[in-house]
Amino acid sequence: MIKRLLLLLTLTLSTLKGWSQDPQFSQFYANPLYLNPAMAGSALAPRATVNYRNQWPALSANFVTTSFGADIYLPRFNSGLGMLVLTDSQGLGNLKSTEVGLQYAYQLRLNEETYVRMGLQGTFATRTLDYFGLTFGDQYSNQGYTGNPTQEPIVGNGIPQVSYADFSSGAIVYSDWYWAGLAMHHINRPDQSFSGLELARLPMKTSFHAGLRIPFAGYTYLGDELDREKTISPAIMYKSQGKFDQFDAGLYVTYSPMVFGAWYRGIPIKKYAENINNHESLIVLAGFRQDKFSIGYSYDATISTLGFASGGAHEISLSYIFEEITPKRPRPRRKDRQLSCPKF
């Protein structure tokens, strides 16, 4: 009985934590528009992405997130345009959110080898909370749950909904062998209160991501295009939102057309609380990329107090890059350089 109560408490706290945190993706480079608005148009061609994540599938308090992204590069203006649609359903209480964001990014050449991209994003978001399945304090007595209907006034108002505008920005600098980016989401800290009686501001999220691309064998070219990539890419990401922060460190191995990766997520030098270590998950990834198409699968093995009872997290990513758009009267220019970060 004690173990069940502890598990319920852990799930409840994790769900409440999720209300003030953004959904996360382990394959963050497979969802570039969600990671950093500066990555809009970074494929230098029209691109479409789909990402699906199911976290804690073995529990009723699971988190299911789906996103669709589309972006395009406009070479005449050194600019990228993007659109991101995201839906998220968070476990206990059926908290659901839908977001539609538009992005603009500008690409600037610093020198022969180095580029910088800067991006802005405007988002319209809607959240709803279905109280079905939730219980409240007045439904309990000394003997436990009574089953009586709650008298909480907010429950009688139907399914509450809140909508708000949200703004984000980001930048990334890169060359053929490294990249480093910084993104700031929810700069305006919008109010997401359902009752409207008190402010419930969405905390700003700051994330830093960086890595290296190291060849372990010679590149194979087909004409002017890279035909087979053989690289090792160590990478890190740190993000902070409100009172919560997270660190990811891992390695990609690319041997075209296959990509494999392994990651650790957690901050071992920082504890959640006394005697509770900050170890979250170990992540493994397998991906396939052929021509313009990419598909990836990753699994998060939970190593926190939830353990294997949660079922970890499953994630699938799809991406397709269309033919480049060339102006009818192209002006003489140097060939732009794609981002060197992995595609998963």
Feature map (PLM): residue ranges:
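Generic N-terminal leader/processing signal
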Residues: 1-2, 15, 34, 326
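Positively charged n-region of N-terminal signal peptides that target proteins for export
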Residues: 1-4, 110-112
